[in-house]
Amino acid sequence: MNELIFLVEEALEGGYVARALGQSIFTEAETLEELRAHVRDAVKCHFDADKAPQIIRLHFVRQEVLTN
């Protein structure tokens, strides 16, 4: 695997949550800096060193509701 994509969203209680697409990896943190570190650590724990993705992409998703 060359690349792994995480969907990142703001948590309702504050902070951020990230989940990997196609893998059972989930992590959360209070700040984006902490989240980046947690994502790297979670990927290291999930994959053997020779099978870890070379690229980790964070895709930020933000939802807004507009009403009239």
Question: How should each PLM-predicted stretch be described?
Answer:
Residues 1-5, 33-68:
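Short, charged, surface-exposed hinge/linker loops at domain edges
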Residues 1-2, 9-11, 29:
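Short secondary-structure boundary micro-motifs
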Residues 4, 16, 25-27:
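Structural detector for hydrophobic anchor residues on beta-strands
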Residues 8-20:
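Short aromatic-glycine-(Arg/Gly/Cys) micro-motifs in beta-strand/loop hairpins
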Residues 20-21, 51:
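Residue-level signal for pocket-adjacent positions within structured domains
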Residues 23-33:
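A short, exposed loop/beta-hairpin motif centered on an aromatic-Gly-Thr core
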